[in-house]
Design a protein with these regions (language model features):
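Asp-based, Mg2+/Mn2+-dependent phosphohydrolase catalytic module
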Residues: 71-78, 87-189
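Short, flexible loop segments at the rims of nucleotide/cofactor-binding pockets, characterized by
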Residues: 57-61, 83, 113
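Conserved short hydrophobic patches within well-ordered secondary structure
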Residues: 1, 49, 83, 94, ...
């Protein structure tokens, strides 16, 4: 992420510090650019950022324990899905590194407002054919908690991630705790 932003600074001539960009992560990329006042250079910034992020993806290690935790949930029959603000190409590459089935994957689309709006979470629940009240959204940024609350989903803050725990949010300290949080029982087909 930082390498990709540094490439934007170098190649596009953007002076906005990485710290300012980082405070906004979790939102769709174009929303971040608008919040930073960079929407006029959006196409070029996005092109450089996305290309660099995809090229650097193999160098970014997964959070320790996440592969095992997701495999255990998958084996239990828990329906797994992803709602992210990352580009579809980067998301596809990342998910290909996991040996689990993700029943729904939601990335930013022009037709659907991104987090903190609830829509991507509602679409994910609909595609997975589960009630939002029986769903849990795990995220590491404040916009994740806002989106979950707006969607009527339980939110668990991933303490191993990037952002600070939002006030009042339940927190997981490590991926292994995903199996200990009282997730809804898998639904029969």
């Amino acid at each position: 992420m930082e390498t990709a932003w540094r490439a934007v600074q170098h190649d596009v001539g953007v002076s906005t510090p990485f710290a300012a960009y980082f405070r906004e992560i979790g939102r769709p990329f174009r929303d971040i650019l608008e919040r930073l006042g960079l929407e006029d250079q959006g196409d070029e910034i996005e092109r450089v950022y996305r290309a660099t992020a995809l090229r650097e993806a193999p160098r970014v290690p997964a959070f320790p324990g996440i592969h095992t935790a997701l495999a255990r949930l998958d084996k239990r029959g828990v329906k797994l899905g992803v709602v992210t603000s990352k580009a579809r190409s980067q998301t596809a590459w990342t998910l290909s590194q996991f040996d689990v089935e993700f029943g729904t994957v939601q990335t930013p689309e022009p037709s659907c407002p991104g987090k903190p709006a609830p829509y991507p979470l509602l679409v994910a629940a609909s595609e997975a054919r589960v009630d939002v009240r029986d769903s849990v959204f795990v995220g590491d940024m404040d916009v994740d908690g806002l989106a979950a609350r707006a969607a009527g989903m339980r939110f668990l803050h991933a303490g191993w991630g990037y952002g600070a725990r939002p006030a009042g949010a339940e927190q997981l300290r490590a991926p292994r705790e995903l199996g200990e949080v009282g997730l809804p029982a898998p639904m029969a087909a």
